[in-house]
């Protein structure tokens, strides 16, 4: 299996979650070994994708520097992970990605429109060799050696609609589109009101998130999956793992994980070369991982 980029440039316009203003997103092909490079068109600022570029993880994953930043990249990056894209230029004209419908499906459709192009250089993945874990109270995220890429996520909320939920997912592009990509982000009405008083979440609506009051889901159409909340957490985790710039071959496990825990996990993984190795897909003993991108 070779490195991938997209066949042609594509673009879409959507609303930014926090400012509530239109954001133009344009994707362009890049050559082998270029990586995923974000670009703030309004600032003429390149931001290469890597854990070193992460500057905030409180409400979303944010990359940048003192010169400028791009927020809420994780939903987009989960689609990039799912399609096995290694090299691409990601251009936005503001400080956040468009939220679209709060899931990844719009980005999947955009990548379908762009098409996938295989390059002349073998694709490398991060193969986890040793268990790596981050714990915070009873919360944890961990990566374990595995010959498959799997995600197991459990959440617990003191809310009658959510309660305790879990989802186990074996990665594959088709599986992602069917089981994970449409799972939306969610928020509580009382929190949204406070955030908007702070000039945040100004673009949040029931068209781009699951809204909940103290008792029920506010969206007239209801949920897309019974455990949509847990599925969205897997979507987030995939996007946060993609901040490494590569697909990761491992078993991911979490209870009540967050963007911050995911960021600390990838940073800890990559901080010690004994934890992992870069392996071409061709070198992997298991061919199942290569078939995941079919």
Swiss-Prot record:
The keyword tRNA-binding does not apply. It comes from the Bacteria. Transmembrane segments: none annotated. It is an enzyme of class 3 (hydrolase). It catalyses: a UDP-3-O-[(3R)-3-hydroxyacyl]-N-acetyl-alpha-D-glucosamine + H2O = a UDP-3-O-[(3R)-3-hydroxyacyl]-alpha-D-glucosamine + acetate. One of its GO terms (molecular function) is UDP-3-O-acyl-N-acetylglucosamine deacetylase activity. One of its GO terms (biological process) is lipid A biosynthetic process. Keywords: Hydrolase, Lipid A biosynthesis, Lipid biosynthesis, Lipid metabolism, Metal-binding, Zinc. Its cofactor is Zn(2+). InterPro entries: Ribosomal_Su5_D2-typ_SF, UDP-acyl_GlcNac_deAcase, UDP-acyl_GlcNac_deAcase_C, UDP-acyl_N-AcGlcN_deAcase_N. The active site is at 259 (proton donor). Its EC number is 3.5.1.108. GO terms for cellular component: membrane. It holds the Pfam family LpxC. Zn(2+) binds at residues 75, 232, 236. Pathway: Glycolipid biosynthesis; lipid IV(A) biosynthesis; lipid IV(A) from (3R)-3-hydroxytetradecanoyl-[acyl-carrier-protein] and UDP-N-acetyl-alpha-D-glucosamine: step 2/6. Belongs to the LpxC family. Catalyzes the hydrolysis of UDP-3-O-myristoyl-N-acetylglucosamine to form UDP-3-O-myristoylglucosamine and acetate, the committed step in lipid A biosynthesis. This is UDP-3-O-acyl-N-acetylglucosamine deacetylase. It comes from Sulfurovum sp. (strain NBC37-1).
């Amino acid at each position: 299996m070779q490195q991938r980029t997209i066949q042609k440039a594509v673009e879409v316009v959507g609303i930014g979650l926090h400012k509530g203003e239109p954001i133009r997103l344009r994707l362009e092909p890049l050559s082998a070994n270029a990586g995923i490079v974000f670009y703030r068109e309004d600032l003429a600022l390149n931001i290469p994708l890597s854990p070193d570029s992460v500057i905030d993880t409180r409400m979303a994953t944010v990359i940048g520097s003192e010169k400028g930043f791009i927020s809420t990249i994780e939903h987009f990056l989960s689609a990039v992970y799912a399609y096995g894209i290694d090299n691409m230029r990601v251009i936005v004209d503001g400080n956040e990605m468009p939220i679209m419908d709060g899931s990844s499906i719009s980005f999947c459709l955009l990548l379908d429109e762009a098409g996938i192009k295989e390059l002349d250089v073998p694709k490398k993945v991060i193969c986890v060799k040793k268990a790596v874990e981050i714990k915070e109270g009873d919360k944890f995220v961990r990566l374990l050696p595995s010959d498959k890429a799997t995600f197991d996520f459990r959440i617990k909320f003191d809310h009658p609609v959510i309660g305790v939920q879990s989802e186990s997912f074996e990665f594959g592009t088709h599986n992602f589109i069917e089981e994970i990509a449409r799972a939306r982000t969610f928020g509580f009405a009382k929190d949204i009101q406070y955030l908007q008083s702070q000039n945040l979440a100004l673009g949040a609506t029931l068209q781009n998130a699951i809204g909940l009051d103290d008792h029920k889901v506010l969206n007239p159409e209801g949920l897309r999956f019974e455990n949509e909340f847990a599925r969205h957490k897997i979507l987030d985790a995939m996007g946060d793992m993609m901040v490494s710039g590569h697909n990761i071959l491992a078993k991911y496990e979490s209870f009540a994980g967050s963007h911050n825990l995911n960021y600390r996990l990838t940073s800890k993984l990559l901080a010690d070369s004994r934890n992992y190795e870069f392996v071409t897909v061709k070198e992997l003993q298991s061919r199942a991982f290569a078939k995941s991108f079919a």
